[in-house]
Amino acid sequence: MRVPAQLLGLLLLWLPGARCAIRMTQSPSSFSASTGDRVTITCRASQGISSYLAWYQQKPGKAPKLLIYAASTLQSGVPSRFSGSGSGTDFTLTISCLQSEDFATYYCQQYYSYP
């Protein structure tokens, strides 16, 4: 049986699990801070990702280090001054009292869907 192309297109739109690429936006893109400061970094997803979000810390010349997964679960060995919150589209990484060893680049990553 032949299915008209228009109908096939509509059916594809309704396929469960069919998703567009998810765009992640972090803010601020850069900032200055001093030891002892409370630092907050936000991450926004272009569509809902439930709690499928991880935060990483990367220092120059080193591989990224996982800090937080499932939006708020601290990876073993990560100091408790790091915390994560949020669900859906809006997420936050907070460092409650910045230490000298925390000066680094921080990234969020969604793992709700893959390209």
From Swiss-Prot:
The keyword Hydrolase does not apply. The keyword Transmembrane does not apply. Residues 77-108 are annotated as: Framework-3. Residues 21-43 are annotated as: Framework-1. GO terms for cellular component: extracellular region; immunoglobulin complex; plasma membrane. InterPro entries: Ig-like_dom, Ig-like_dom_sf, Ig-like_fold, Ig_V-set, IgV_Light_Chain. Residues 70-76 are annotated as: Complementarity-determining-2. Keywords: Adaptive immunity, Cell membrane, Disulfide bond, Immunity, Immunoglobulin, Immunoglobulin domain, Membrane, Secreted, Signal. Residues 109-115 are annotated as: Complementarity-determining-3. Residues 44-54 are annotated as: Complementarity-determining-1. Pfam families: V-set. Residues 1-20 form the signal peptide. Immunoglobulins are composed of two identical heavy chains and two identical light chains; disulfide-linked. V region of the variable domain of immunoglobulin light chains that participates in the antigen recognition. Immunoglobulins, also known as antibodies, are membrane-bound or secreted glycoproteins produced by B lymphocytes. In the recognition phase of humoral immunity, the membrane-bound immunoglobulins serve as receptors which, upon binding of a specific antigen, trigger the clonal expansion and differentiation of B lymphocytes into immunoglobulins-secreting plasma cells. This is Immunoglobulin kappa variable 1-8. It comes from Homo sapiens. The gene is IGKV1-8.
